Amino acid sequence: MGLKITKGQLRTKDLNQSSSKSSQSSRIGVDTCIFTRMLPRINTAINLTEHLLRRSFHSLTNLQKTQVKERLHELERHGFILNKTSKQLERINSKKRRQLKKLQKTAYPKDQAFHILRKFHKINNEALADTKLGPTSQSDLKFLSLTKDKRLFYTILGVNGEQLRDSKLIANDVQKFLKRGQLEKAVFLARLAKKKGVVGMNLIMKYYIEVVQSQQSAVDIFNWRKKWGVPIDQHSITILFNGLSKQENLVSKKYGELVLKTIDSLCDKNELTEIEYNTALAALINCTDETLVFKLLNKKCPGLKKDSITYTLMIRSCTRIADEKRFMVVLNDLMNKIPDYCVDSKLLFEYCEVICSQKSPKIEKQGMGLWALCEYFQFDKTIFKKYLTQSDFPTLVPLSHWNINKPFPLNKHVVGLFMNYCLKNKEYDLAMEIFKTLEAQNNQMLDQSIYHKYMETVITTRPITCGDECLDIYERVASSAQISITRRTLILVYNAFQRQSLKAVINKDASNAEATLHKIRGFIDSVEATYSSKLNGKVYRFNSWKFLFPIVKNLNMNDKVSTVELKSILDEYLKSLLNGEFGKEFKASIEDKRFVTLEGIRLVKVLTERIKLPSLDSEEIASLKGTERKKFLARRHLLRLKQILLEDLADIEGNSRRKGDSENTSTSEERIMEDLAELILETSYDKF
């Protein structure tokens, strides 16, 4: 249905339009005026917006083709649609390469490793039957030389590629291999690590030097590591030189030349440090060719500042000079050249030790080592002058030469060197007086070793009273909280009594012999005897009998020890037997067991001869009464004991003739021995 409009309505509409146009024209005039005024501002805003839009569009412009366009382009050119675009293929290949690279850094599972060994290396199942793969296995070493597959190496060594990038982890694994004695795997792991295996290879060199005691192997590792791509650092050189310097025997000339060659190389590169120079000096001092150390001393190394350790080693190198005159000339010349800042107590101690160790009759006779100790350290010079006369030997360099006003304080190393030198050159009286002076001052520097040297001096110089004096020294040492008692201390006391018991003044006088015997037995009772719950008392240990029997033998060489005293010693010996001190489970050498058993047999023999009776027939034996009867029975018991001890001696020597069940036989013999020992212990020899 259409819309109808009348003429009146049309006229009204036209009028309205004309009026609206007139009003609009008036408004436009006003707006034009306003717009004209605002135009500069609008232009500025439009320009700014346009500028920002331009930068945004420029930064967001996509200059690469999209995957859709690339596929359409290929469709137009070749008539088919690509499954993967080149960019997608590149991304996939890159991902595969990363995964493969990551896989190459992992170890094979053990089943896969065995499969590879069978397939690619043609190893049969029989060879692999008893083979285990892993870091703790020893049966897989042969496969390390068959393959170049790193993943198989990782399986055998128990590592992966990521761990090879960490030098600390490599060093820890190398240390584990070395503790298990797997040197081949340790070396192979360090080789695989290349630059990260420097610390591990240093540990291997140190192991060869200190544990295996193979300097040649350490030198081989030092040379080969360059070819393996494992660099040599400062610690590598120090470990090698230090190991050569600590070898018990002098190292050969070729090792000395290697040291010199290495130092020359470092010196040419201006990389030589004091540590490397000092260790090289120490190594060359221990070389058979003494000329090499002096070549190093005369070598000019630019940039090297010699310290006190360097000069100390230089002094030590003078010990290689055999000629006496040249020794003193070189040594004194060196001492004069030492700068003030390098002189300390350690350097002067080394100087004194070098003089004391020189095996020159003239130097020893002149006592130059003692005078050097007196000059540089705070010894009492009045005591020295009382026992020594200063002979014509080269004058010592005075302390004033280095602007030092007074001698250095004493320490245990200096006193120990002094005591050693006195023992070596038989200056016993000087050593004893100096020791007593220091002990009277309650000097804390007197340690265990110095007391031992003093006891050795007493044993050497005073054979008649050395046992009593060493026992007194032992008691002083035992009362000191700073000094501990060792087995060496006890042995020195025993040695002192053994030496004292050999003197005729002691063993030819009954009272002196028994007094000495009582002292040594009292010492054993208080120090070495242990409580036995089985016997409810103290018993002597096996080690005590090794020393007591010789002392008893010496004291009784003139039959001055009474029968009662010998019976008392036999009683102690039987108590030790009953307590199991000489049993099979006791750990002692065959020689010691044989010696103690023989001495026990000799003691029984002496007692048997002491209570010997005239020959009697059966009727006379039956008629014996009282003391004679007891004496006869006691002698019979001793003879039975002697027979048992002889059988024990045969067992020790491996010549036993006992037959039957060993367990039953030993049990019955123990019962017989216990019964016999109880009978002997109950018998008193006071009236024999």
UniProtKB/Swiss-Prot annotation:
Anything else of interest in the record?
Present with 432 molecules/cell in log phase SD medium.
The source's domain of life comes to Eukaryota
Q: Where is the signal peptide?
A: none
Keywords of the record, alphabetical order, are: Mitochondrion, Transit peptide
State the species of origin: Saccharomyces cerevisiae (strain ATCC 204508 / S288c)
Instruction: Give the range of the organelle targeting sequence.
Output: 1-46
Concerning Pfam families, the annotation shows: PPR_2
On whether Transit peptide is a keyword of this UniProt record, the answer is yes
Q: Which InterPro entries match?
A: Pentatricopeptide_rpt, TPR-like_helical_dom_sf
Q: Where, subcellularly, is it found?
A: Mitochondrion
Stretches for region Disordered:
1-24
Q: Does the keyword Transcription apply?
A: no
Q: Could you tell me what this protein does? A: Component of MIOREX complexes, large expressome-like assemblies of ribosomes with factors involved in all the steps of post-transcriptional gene expression.
What do the Gene Ontology cellular component annotations say? mitochondrion
Q: What is this protein called?
A: MIOREX complex component 1
The subunit structure is: Associates with the mitochondrial ribosome.
Q: Which Gene3D superfamilies match?
A: Tetratricopeptide repeat domain
